[in-house]
């Protein structure tokens, strides 16, 4: 997972499937940082993700709750059709690409 903070948005680009080990990093390292730094906007780029397990879904929900605590927004972008089916119940806004995230949040 690669992180970049730009224009008030934390871009998280996953470079592999979101499984137990990635979920652990999200829950134990990333979410506390989101809360302590009061990060309000996150874009999750799913371009290189082929699969997500239950631990991954839970981690995304935990991240969504952290962002809501900060009165922010979270978006998924570049989501494959296969992943859209798995992610439909977590109710995170899906947009086509990172530029659309910037437009949605109003950063440009």
Report the location of each language-model feature:
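STAS-like cytosolic regulatory interaction modules
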Residues: 1-50, 62-108
